[in-house]
């Protein structure tokens, strides 16, 4: 295990050095460079489990970043942190903001669906079948969109949609 960790640390460090070199020579505005640096530092903090620090960096990046795709990616990473921290409602809101910035992020839809499906399973365990069906239907709705954006990328979700009877034939076209 230590060898894998050393290799991963080496790869992370090498990537950081290469990325910094590219950012320095790229003909982009200082504001965009700073946004990227905050994003990169947020990613590093997130990978190290320093979620509070990562959120600080991501928020700084969002203040500077104008590119919608990059903003969407930053928001998606923030939503992942909220999800990891058990802040499901905040995570959903942040995923939705990410999708407003960049609607072509199937992983955001997938993760929203995971939260809905989890809530459905919880309702089922508590014997509330109406709530279960509501949450499962919501999961199916967002997962269907994810599968359309990334066909074949979420086979487990496609299987769930089929076996739960919540798929529509056009998902697979």
From Swiss-Prot:
GO biological process terms, semicolon-separated: photosynthesis
SMART domains for this protein: TPR (SM00028)
Transmembrane segments: none
Listed PANTHER family: CELLULOSE SYNTHASE OPERON PROTEIN C, TPR REPEAT-CONTAINING PROTEIN MJ0263
Keyword annotations: Membrane, Photosynthesis, Repeat, Thylakoid, TPR repeat
Superkingdom of this protein's organism: Bacteria
One of the record's GO cellular component terms: plasma membrane-derived thylakoid membrane
TPR-type repeats, residues: 35-68, 72-105, 120-153
Encoding gene, per UniProt annotation: ycf3
Membrane topology: Peripheral membrane protein
Functional description taken from the UniProt entry: Essential for the assembly of the photosystem I (PSI) complex. May act as a chaperone-like factor to guide the assembly of the PSI subunits.
Subcellular location: Cellular thylakoid membrane
Protein name: Photosystem I assembly protein Ycf3
Organism: Prochlorococcus marinus subsp. pastoris (strain CCMP1986 / NIES-2087 / MED4)
Family according to the record: Belongs to the Ycf3 family.
């Amino acid at each position: 295990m230590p060898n894998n960790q050393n290799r991963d640390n080496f790869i992370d460090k090498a990537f950081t050095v290469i990325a910094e070199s590219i950012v320095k020579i790229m003909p982009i505005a200082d504001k965009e460079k700073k946004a990227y640096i905050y994003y990169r530092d947020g990613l590093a903090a997130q990978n190290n489990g320093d979620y509070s620090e990562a959120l600080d960096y991501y928020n700084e990046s969002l203040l500077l970043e104008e590119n919608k795709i990059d903003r969407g990616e930053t928001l998606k990473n923030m939503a992942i942190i909220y999800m990891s921290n058990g802040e499901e409602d905040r995570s959903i809101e942040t995923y939705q903001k990410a999708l407003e910035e960049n609607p072509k992020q199937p992983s955001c839809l997938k993760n929203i669906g995971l939260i809905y499906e989890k809530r459905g399973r919880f309702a089922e365990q508590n014997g509330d079948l109406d709530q279960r069906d509501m949450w499962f239907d919501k999961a199916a709705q967002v997962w269907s969109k994810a599968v359309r954006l990334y066909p074949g990328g979420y086979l487990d979700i496609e299987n769930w949609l089929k076996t739960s009877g919540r798929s529509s034939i056009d998902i697979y076209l």
